[in-house]
A protein has these predicted regions:
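Catalytic center-proximal scaffold of phosphoryl-transfer enzymes
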Residues: 1-198
Length: 198
């Protein structure tokens, strides 16, 4: 609940508690407890072998130096499903500059799974594995909407090929990470090789 509404609610109950006081409590709690916690989560994340990365626009009202209509970004970093620890960090930044993931991922030496945004391409020591879901969406968006039958199109063929990979992932969802790797090598790798040779 927004602080101005909490202030009204407390006043209705007979207590004078200003939103400034509550905002100060939040700031102190963040500095004392949440920032160290997020820093520890970041340390743990940097030890992972794979990290999902994605950035999404958000609109922030009354942000200093920016128009109300301008976009800011929430950069989301997440450990993979098979990780021993589930770590997700939301990193707010006022822009979409490549320096944002470079700073966040500094010292990481594993693989990042991304949507293909160029900002992830220049991070030292990192392997970039692009996300199949994002790739599928690009091909799906390229399907002609005015055609009665798009089955012979390049985009549809790509969507179908990626769907076969997704079907395998659905089948192995509950397997251990080691078993998933084995099945992926046996079943998914030939499909991926076919996709890139096609």
């Amino acid at each position: 609940m927004p602080l101005y509404r909490q202030e009204s609610e407390w006043k209705r109950l007979g207590m004078e508690l200003s939103r400034t006081t509550m905002a100060n409590w939040i700031i102190i709690a963040a500095k004392e407890y949440f920032i160290p916690l997020v820093n520890r989560m970041h340390e743990l994340m940097m030890k992972e072998s794979h990290i999902h990365c994605d950035e999404t626009p958000v609109q922030v009202l009354n942000e200093p130096g920016k128009k109300v209509t301008s976009k800011s970004y929430m950069w989301v970093y997440s450990s993979i499903k098979e990780s021993k620890r589930s770590v997700k960090i939301f990193d707010y930044r006022p822009d979409r500059k490549a320096t944002n993931p470079q700073e966040f991922l500094k010292g990481f030496g594993g693989t990042i799974i991304t949507d293909g945004y160029y900002g992830y391409n220049h991070i030292d020591g990192v392997t970039n594995a692009y996300c199949w879901a994002h790739a599928r969406r690009k091909f799906y968006d390229a399907l002609p909407v005015d055609m009665k039958d798009a089955s012979d199109t390049f985009a549809n063929t790509a969507v179908e090929k990626i769907a076969r990979l997704f079907a395998i992932e659905k089948q192995i969802e509950t397997l251990s990470p080691d078993k998933k790797v084995k099945v992926r090598q046996e079943k998914s790798k030939p499909l991926v090789d076919d996709f890139f040779s096609w």
